[in-house]
UniProtKB/Swiss-Prot annotation:
SUPFAM superfamilies: ClpS-like. It comes from the Bacteria. Binds to the N-terminal domain of the chaperone ClpA. This is ATP-dependent Clp protease adapter protein ClpS. It comes from Pseudomonas savastanoi pv. phaseolicola (strain 1448A / Race 6). Belongs to the ClpS family.
Length: 120
């Protein structure tokens, strides 16, 4: 027989605990982090005298996933009130959508302006 065959290993499978805490009677609980909702931003379209209404409806359908009826209502609000909110998003998404709309409008040679504003 080999010398190693007589060795017996015993593993402690209990969770490690400090006996000092038990003796002191102190209960310890980890602090749970509190999560807050990120600040939201409005994406706003502004009226101008040159951008066709159909183009504004197209922008609302393509970039904001609005159906034709809702896109038309928002377009009419932009036309009559001078501006309208297209959606409410976190900052990164709002900035991206505004940039995409402005870039698409410039490529299509329209002066349509889209900006973001902090909600609240």
């Amino acid at each position: 027989m080999h010398a190693f065959s007589k060795i017996r290993l015993t593993f402690n499978q209990d969770s490690p605990q400090s006996h000092e805490d038990d003796a002191a009677g102190i209960a310890v609980q980890d602090a749970k982090p509190t999560l807050q909702a990120p600040p939201m931003y409005k994406v706003v379209l502004f009226n101008d005298d040159y951008t066709p209404m159909d183009f504004v409806v197209e922008v609302l359908e393509v970039f904001f996933n609005l159906n034709r009826e809702l896109a038309t209502k928002v377009m009419l609000a932009v036309h009559t009130e001078g501006r309208a909110v297209c959606g409410l998003f976190t900052r990164d998404i709002a900035e991206t959508k505004a940039m995409q709309v402005n870039q698409y409008a410039r490529e299509s040679q329209h002066p349509l302006l889209c900006e973001i504003e902090k909600d609240g």
